[in-house]
């Protein structure tokens, strides 16, 4: 029986995407071989037969033996010159242009292009409209995709039929290409429903990681001991644990990240998994769970309640998500947007967007209605930050939160998560990484045009982390309990951090400059000695990363570079090579002998060094007068007033500090000296340089040829300030 054109199964499509993920080939590379290379013999006019198609897949996917069912399904999904027959495809042909177009779109085509291609795929009579029979085929494919995604298809067909009627904007009884593209790009996630965006198919699959167990653990499948100190596999999402050899027979993962039926929306139920009771005590009866003797006890994957098997009947059906409910999006709060009622779909905020503003994919296929009075947390993790810390943090958050709240930045980037959360009220963002990762997220938020800016907290990974220090999140994560950190986040307060635009205007010169790393300052900017040290540090770390894998080593390397810089003094008499203007007025540097100037948005630099220094309150009325002036004036250069100024990352002003040399910089970095020389506090600053000088923005150094640099206020970003540390009294007790 001939197979319907276009109806490649969702499982086949998912398998194809896996092959493409690991392939390095581009369609353009393969086409060259078919046009004038060794594969030209398979081309028949503008078409290829099944044998040629198999060769195309073999080269493009870099797989010697593509499964026959997959190659046949793909071959039969394209326009053909003859009636297809599953038993004999040797005489059939497909258009090479259709094949190349399809795979080019999968490589990364625009949503509009994908929608146009799918329209032509289902418009079998090529009359430019989709009639009722063609719409029925589309609904059939959507039902197959929904079944593959484990949705409740019993209630879905009438919903899809109603949705397809809504796409017919002019009520003509058919769907034009313009209506199809408009709907798919603004209101209806057609590409997801047709199986062309398959990232929703995560549920039911364990996320295994090897784990060595320091105490007795029992296999969830065969229930025998894995062995003390032996390695097994544990699922990051549900803690289902097995022997290596038992993994293939394991039951599906119990974690469903979103509701797949209308009846599951709104109320969350407990999801119990046997074992995994790490505390060893029942949360219901408070008695011990004998976890060392057999596979016993139950734990809920959402509230993390741990109970005896016999206590299950005493625990209610409904799950409140436990102590971290303020941060968690339970599956009952996330559901396919197609399950929303018709009026809700029509009034959706996405319907007001244009195609240029939106890429309807997985993020728009799901709708989020959070539990009232909660603050859903969107977590971005850079797994490369902090050595192996980033990966471990990613695993932990995937367990304690809904995995759909947690994004691997190296794999997904931040855009998908921001699109998913764009309409979620009272949401927060947690960035797990260094200052560079935080800057990346803030820049992406800038470009995302979100209706409301969610406040951002930082879990610092690795070294440095000046911004995290200023926001009271510490200098680096050291394996603390993440649940406690999330409870601290509940007590945090919002501050609006200034961000500054940097414009570098090079002079006409034959000398070539390094690229400027950023156009925005979040932390600091500097010229001269400290940038020179940072530049040498940066080059050495890129060349020999293994020598810079601890904070102590970094400090020693920095001190060594500072010592050599003090000998060569490459930035001596800096005032002869640059002039500084603050709010249009020149800053007098003539009586100073400086080798560096730092412009600070936050008081921390180089992993905790406070270049501005502490502000101590002296006695006398003059202090109060000076402090009042310092809190209001846009430009301050008076040394007496500067002594009273306290850095504030929300005051739309910058602190300007002079550095006398590398030795002073090294002393500040190693805490042997308190601060540099306070020069000014201002809301705008301009540098004019006459020779090539080292510079840095937020720890990223570069060499800059003669230029003009303008720093102006850009905007403010809501950030979360951690709660103040609890003090201890003389006897060591918390006060």
From Swiss-Prot:
MF GO annotations: alkylglycerol kinase activity; ATP binding; ATP-dependent diacylglycerol kinase activity; calcium ion binding; kinase activity; lipid binding; phospholipid binding; zinc ion binding
One Gene Ontology biological process: phosphatidic acid biosynthetic process
Compartment(s): Cytoplasm, Cytosol
Reaction catalyzed: a 1,2-diacyl-sn-glycerol + ATP = a 1,2-diacyl-sn-glycero-3-phosphate + ADP + H(+); a 1-O-alkyl-sn-glycerol + ATP = a 1-O-alkyl-sn-glycero-3-phosphate + ADP + H(+); 1-O-alkyl-2-acyl-sn-glycerol + ATP = 1-O-alkyl-2-acyl-sn-glycero-3-phosphate + ADP + H(+); 1,2-dihexadecanoyl-sn-glycerol + ATP = 1,2-dihexadecanoyl-sn-glycero-3-phosphate + ADP + H(+)
Zinc finger (Phorbol-ester/DAG-type): 205-253, 269-319
SUPFAM superfamilies xrefs: Cysteine-rich domain (SSF57889), EF-hand (SSF47473), NAD kinase/diacylglycerol kinase-like (SSF111331)
Effect on the protein upon substituting residue 179 to Q: Loss of calcium-binding
CDD domains according to UniProt: C1_DGK_typeI_rpt1, C1_DGKalpha_rpt2, EFh
InterPro entries: ATP-NAD_kinase_N (IPR017438), C1-like_sf (IPR046349), C1_DGKalpha_rpt2 (IPR047469), DAG_kinase_typeI_N (IPR029477), DGK (IPR037607), DGK_typeI_N_sf (IPR038199), Diacylglycerol_kin_accessory (IPR000756), Diacylglycerol_kinase_cat_dom (IPR001206)
GO CC annotation, single: cytosol
Biochemical pathway: Lipid metabolism; glycerolipid metabolism
Presence of the UniProt keyword Calcium in the record: yes
Function: Diacylglycerol kinase that converts diacylglycerol/DAG into phosphatidic acid/phosphatidate/PA and regulates the respective levels of these two bioactive lipids. Thereby, acts as a central switch between the signaling pathways activated by these second messengers with different cellular targets and opposite effects in numerous biological processes. Also plays an important role in the biosynthesis of complex lipids. Can also phosphorylate 1-alkyl-2-acylglycerol in vitro as efficiently as diacylglycerol provided it contains an arachidonoyl group.
Similarity comment: Belongs to the eukaryotic diacylglycerol kinase family.
Subunit text: Monomer.
Protein name: Diacylglycerol kinase alpha
Organism of provenance: Homo sapiens
């Amino acid at each position: 029986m001939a197979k319907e054109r276009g109806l490649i199964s969702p499982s086949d499509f998912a398998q194809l995407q896996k092959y493409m993920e690991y392939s390095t080939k581009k369609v353009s590379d393969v086409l060259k071989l078919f046009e004038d290379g060794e594969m030209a013999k398979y081309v028949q006019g503008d078409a290829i037969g099944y044998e040629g198609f198999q060769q195309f897949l073999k080269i493009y996917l870099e797989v010697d033996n593509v499964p026959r069912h997959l190659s046949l399904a793909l071959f039969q999904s394209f326009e053909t010159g003859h009636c297809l027959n599953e038993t004999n495809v040797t005489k059939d042909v497909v258009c090479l242009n259709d094949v190349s177009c399809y795979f080019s779109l999968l490589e990364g085509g625009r949503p509009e292009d994908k929608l146009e291609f799918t329209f032509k795929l289902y418009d079998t009579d090529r009359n430019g409209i989709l009639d009722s029979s063609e719409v029925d085929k589309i609904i059939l494919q959507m039902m197959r995709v929904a079944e593959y995604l484990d949705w409740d298809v019993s209630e879905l067909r009438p919903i899809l039929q109603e949705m397809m009627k809504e796409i017919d904007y002019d009520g003509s009884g058919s769907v034009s290409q313009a209506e199809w593209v408009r709907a798919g790009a603004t209101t209806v996630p057609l590409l997801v429903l047709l199986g062309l965006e398959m990232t929703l198919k995560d549920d039911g699959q364990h996320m295994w990681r090897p784990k060595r167990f320091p105490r007795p653990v029992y296999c969830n499948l065969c229930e025998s001991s894995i062995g003390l100190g032996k390695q097994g596999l544990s699922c990051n999402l549900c803690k289902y644990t097995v022997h290596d050899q038992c993994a293939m027979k394991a039951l599906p993962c119990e974690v469903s990240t979103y509701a797949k039926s209308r009846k599951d929306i709104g109320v969350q139920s407990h999801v119990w998994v046997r074992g995994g009771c790490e505390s060893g005590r029942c949360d219901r009866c408070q008695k011990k769970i004998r976890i060392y003797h057999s596979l016993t006890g139950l734990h809920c994957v959402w509230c993390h309640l741990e109970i005896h098997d016999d206590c299950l009947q005493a625990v209610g059906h409904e799950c409140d998500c436990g102590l971290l409910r303020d941060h968690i999006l339970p599956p009952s709060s996330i559901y396919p947007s197609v399950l929303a009622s018709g009026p809700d779909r029509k009034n959706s905020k996405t319907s007001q967007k244009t195609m240029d503003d939106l890429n309807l994919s997985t993020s728009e296929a799901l709708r989020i209605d959070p539990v009232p009075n909660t603050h859903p947390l969107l977590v971005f993790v850079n797994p490369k930050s902090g050595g192996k810390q980033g990966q471990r943090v990613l695993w932990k958050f995937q367990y304690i939160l809904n995995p759909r709240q947690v994004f691997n930045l190296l794999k997904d980037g931040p855009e998908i998560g921001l699109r998913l959360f764009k309409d979620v009220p009272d949401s927060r963002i947690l960035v797990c990484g260094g200052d560079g990762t935080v800057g990346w997220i803030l820049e992406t938020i800038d470009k995302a045009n979100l209706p409301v800016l969610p406040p951002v907290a930082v879990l610092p990974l690795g070294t440095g982390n000046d911004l995290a220090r200023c926001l009271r999140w510490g200098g680096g994560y050291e394996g603390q309990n993440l649940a406690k950190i999330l409870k601290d986040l509940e007590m945090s307060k919002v501050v609006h951090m200034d961000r500054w635009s940097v414009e570098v205007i090079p002079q006409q010169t034959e000398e070539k400059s390094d690229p400027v790393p950023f156009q925005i300052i979040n932390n600091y900017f500097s010229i001269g000695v400290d940038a020179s040290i940072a530049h040498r540090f940066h080059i050495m770390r890129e060349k020999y990363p293994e020598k810079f894998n601890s904070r102590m080593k970094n400090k020693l390397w920095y001190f060594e570079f500072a010592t050599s810089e003090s000998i060569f003094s490459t930035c001596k008499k800096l005032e002869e090579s640059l002039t500084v203007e603050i709010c249009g007025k020149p800053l007098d540097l003539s009586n100073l002998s400086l080798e560096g100037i730092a412009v600070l948005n936050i008081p921390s630099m180089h992993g905790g060094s406070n270049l501005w220094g502490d502000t101590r309150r002296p006695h006398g009325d003059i202090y109060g007068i000076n402090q009042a002036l310092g809190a209001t004036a846009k430009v301050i250069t008076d040394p007496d007033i500067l002594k009273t100024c306290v850095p504030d990352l929300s005051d739309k002003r910058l602190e300007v500090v002079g550095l006398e040399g590398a030795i002073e910089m090294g002393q500040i970095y190693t805490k042997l000296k308190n601060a540099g020389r306070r020069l000014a506090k201002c809301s705008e600053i301009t540098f004019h340089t006459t020779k090539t000088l080292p510079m840095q923005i937020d720890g990223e150094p570069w060499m800059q040829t003669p230029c003009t640099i303008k720093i102006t206020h850009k905007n403010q970003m809501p950030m979360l300030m951690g709660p103040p540390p609890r003090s201890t009294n003389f006897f060591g007790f918390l006060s």
